[in-house]
């Protein structure tokens, strides 16, 4: 009988052991879930509209201001300071420490100010009178066409003038063609004579155009002093063209930004200073060739030809004056 009681005691002990372990497991599971929940909360993103700055999620700065210092509590507002009126702005909630620079309406490109820049709104530009642009965001406006035979539709800020066409009879068109032919042919002998004479003078002075194997024309004068032409060259170029050229020819972005910042509302001066800075950096040697060939590579051949004509005519005029002076001195 005592043996039966001993056997029953062993059975109860075996059953009670697993049950007590099961109860312990039930108790520790909630603690494990709580740890996981805390980790998930720490790793979660900030609420919508907030941004993590250091250890806290911060509110954004409102339009017209920029962040000066981070928030010091969860969900708090950072220290924000106003943008500079008329110089920079922000037009939406943001977390940046910088305002955006106001747009400049370039008068040389046919633009004028429609609405001034404020702390919360960028400058709004429009075409000047007698200029138009087809796109909503214009970098430059084109001059309106002037009609010779009447206007069908006037020029507007978004469309060019539509001119009335004059239809002529076959006889009048034929006479007009003969007239144009005469006007074109009459000056040809004089132009040929002048060109031959000029080439002879150049040959006498050892001044010849170099022969090139490629299609790109190399300037006849390689080491012309561009210093006195900088302003005239700048007048022929757009600010975007000047920035693109100097950027590709060694001027760092920080220097470009510095020049733009020093002359914020004077596009003409920005172009002059950018080109002058490049010329000082490059030096006189081959600067003229670099300018002309750089414009051609940028598919601005018409602009390169225009600048080339300005310099070539000036240099040719100086040489002709020098030759004339030498001839006068030899006669005396």
Curated annotation (Swiss-Prot):
SUPFAM superfamilies: DEATH domain (SSF47986), TNF receptor-like (SSF57586). Residues 227-311 form the Death domain. Disulfide bonds join 46-57, 58-71, 61-80, 83-99, 102-117, 105-125, 127-141, 144-155, 147-163. The modification Phosphothreonine is found at residue 212. Glycans are attached at residues 38, 116. A lipid is attached at residue 200 (S-palmitoyl cysteine). GO terms for cellular component: CD95 death-inducing signaling complex; external side of plasma membrane; membrane raft. GO terms for molecular function: calmodulin binding; tumor necrosis factor receptor activity. The keyword Disulfide bond applies. Keywords: Apoptosis, Calmodulin-binding, Cell membrane, Disulfide bond, Glycoprotein, Lipoprotein, Membrane, Palmitate, Phosphoprotein, Receptor, Repeat, Signal, Transmembrane, Transmembrane helix. It is a single-pass type I membrane protein. It comes from the Eukaryota. Contains a death domain involved in the binding of FADD, and maybe to other cytosolic adapter proteins. This is Tumor necrosis factor receptor superfamily member 6. It comes from Sus scrofa.
């Amino acid at each position: 009988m005592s043996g039966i009681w001993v056997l029953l005691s062993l059975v109860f002990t075996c059953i009670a052991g697993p049950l007590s372990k099961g109860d312990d497991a039930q108790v520790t599971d909630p603690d494990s879930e709580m740890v996981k929940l805390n980790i998930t909360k720490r790793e979660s993103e900030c609420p919508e509209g907030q941004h993590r700055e250091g250890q806290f999620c911060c509110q954004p700065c409102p339009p017209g201001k920029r962040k000066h210092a981070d928030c010091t509590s969860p969900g708090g507002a950072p220290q924000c300071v106003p943008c500079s009126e008329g110089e920079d702005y922000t037009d939406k909630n943001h977390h940046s420490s910088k305002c955006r620079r106001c747009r400049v309406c370039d008068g040389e490109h046919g633009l004028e100010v429609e609405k001034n820049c404020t702390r919360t709104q960028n400058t709004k530009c429009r075409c000047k009178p007698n200029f138009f642009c087809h796109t909503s965001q214009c970098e430059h406006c084109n001059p309106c066409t002037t009609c010779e035979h009447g206007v069908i539709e006037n020029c507007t800020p978004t469309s060019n003038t539509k001119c009335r066409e004059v239809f002529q009879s076959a006889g009048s068109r034929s006479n007009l063609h003969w007239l144009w032919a005469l006007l074109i042919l009459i000056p040809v002998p004089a132009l040929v004579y002048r060109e031959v004479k000029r080439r002879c003078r150049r040959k006498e002075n050892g001044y010849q155009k170099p022969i090139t194997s490629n299609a790109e024309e190399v300037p006849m004068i390689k080491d012309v002093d561009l210093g006195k032409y900088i302003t005239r060259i700048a007048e022929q170029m757009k600010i975007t063209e000047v920035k693109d050229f100097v950027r590709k020819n060694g001027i760092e972005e920080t220097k470009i930004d510095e020049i733009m910042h020093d002359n914020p509302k004077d596009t003409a001066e920005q172009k002059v200073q950018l080109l002058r800075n490049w010329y000082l950096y490059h030096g006189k040697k081959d600067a003229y060739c670099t300018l002309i060939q750089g414009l051609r590579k940028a598919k601005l051949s018409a602009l390169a030809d225009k600048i080339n004509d300005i310099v070539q005519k000036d240099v040719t005029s100086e040489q002709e004056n020098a030759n004339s002076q030498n001839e006068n001195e030899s006669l005396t």
